[in-house]
């Protein structure tokens, strides 16, 4: 008379990373006032690797520091080099404090930087900006 429970198979989904062999990639660095997100893509825009300061273990206000951006860029560069990336074009977006440090870290890791381009959007008188902080 008891209700029978259905057993769900909890098969482990093994995420296997397919090793691509890409020599030239595009690095997208989005640096906001709260976090730094780095995505490494191929020329078509398919993501090879990504990393953010939050996923690296930085919490709260430490995510927006240049040091967090440097560690995030090192981890993203290592993941990209596993796929054979030797040269990168860097696209920087945002006004955060980690944008310069992240771009410099890719050069320090031994990856040849072909170009650095700022793709931060400029509003054509769009949304009203937030009011100034008091203090």
UniProtKB/Swiss-Prot annotation:
Function text: Located on the platform of the 30S subunit, it bridges several disparate RNA helices of the 16S rRNA. Forms part of the Shine-Dalgarno cleft in the 70S ribosome.
Name of the molecule in the record: Small ribosomal subunit protein uS11
Record lineage: Bacteria, Bacillati, Actinomycetota, Rubrobacteria, Rubrobacterales
Transcription found in the keyword field: no
Gene3D superfamilies linked: Ribosomal protein S11
Region called Disordered, residue ranges: 1-20
Sequence similarity: Belongs to the universal ribosomal protein uS11 family.
An annotated Gene Ontology molecular function: structural constituent of ribosome
Keyword Oxidoreductase annotated: no
Keyword terms, alphabetized: Ribonucleoprotein, Ribosomal protein, RNA-binding, rRNA-binding
Any single GO CC term annotated in Swiss-Prot or TrEMBL for this entry: ribosome
Ranges in a coiled coil: none
Alphabetized InterPro entries for the sequence: Ribosomal_uS11 (IPR001971), Ribosomal_uS11_bac-type (IPR019981), Ribosomal_uS11_sf (IPR036967)
GO BP: any one term: translation
Oligomer and partners: Part of the 30S ribosomal subunit. Interacts with proteins S7 and S18. Binds to IF-3.
Domain of life: Bacteria
HAMAP family per record: Ribosomal_uS11 (MF_01310)
Intrachain disulfide bonds: none
Matching Pfam families: Ribosomal_S11
